[in-house]
Design a protein with these regions (language model features):
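Alpha-helix capping/helix-boundary segments
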Residues: 12-13, 43, 77, 96-97, ...
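Acidic, PIN/NYN-like endoribonuclease modules and their adjacent C-terminal/linker elements
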Residues: 1-4, 98-126
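Short, well-structured N-terminal submotif of metal-dependent ribonuclease cores
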Residues: 1-39, 49-62
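Acidic catalytic patch
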Residues: 66-87
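Short glycine/serine/threonine/alanine-rich loop segments
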Residues: 86, 90, 106
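Structured helix-beta-strand junction loops
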Residues: 33-34, 67-68, 104
Length: 126
């Protein structure tokens, strides 16, 4: 087995953890192999940073994250995220997640069609 081929957006992880149909359907549509998934460091921070997270939810999230490759931010991701944010107006976490998928050559799995639409030109230049 090789490394990851999908980067999961935070909304997909939340959906999968909660058993939401749109996230599950998306994962099934792409035949997602949970052994080949990654998340951005920012997704990990978003998931574990919820203020009302109880111990059981945190444990559930940590177990899921334990199955994922967590991609740490580096200078290349930072630079592209800045360019994406400045040119598209995306929220910084979305720009970071998008930049991570592009720099690491991973397919981004998201329920946010706007995120994909607004970053298409960056994906085409890699």
């Amino acid at each position: 087995m090789s490394g990851p081929n999908w980067l999961l957006d935070t909304n997909v992880v939340i959906g999968l953890l909660k058993g939401n149909k749109p996230a599950i359907d998306l994962a099934e549509d792409v035949q997602l192999d949970l052994r080949r998934i990654a998340v951005s460091q920012i997704t990990r921070m978003e998931l574990l940073g919820f203020q009302s997270l109880d111990a059981s939810e945190e444990d559930h999230i940590r177990r899921f994250l334990g199955c994922c490759h967590v991609i740490l931010l580096d200078e290349q991701i930072e630079e592209l995220a800045i360019r994406i944010r400045r040119s598209t107006g995306l929220k910084l976490p979305d720009a970071i997640i998008s930049a991570t998928s592009i720099i690491k050559s991973l397919s981004l799995l998201t329920l946010d069609a706007e995120l994909l639409d607004r970053t298409t030109r960056y994906q085409a230049t890699r």
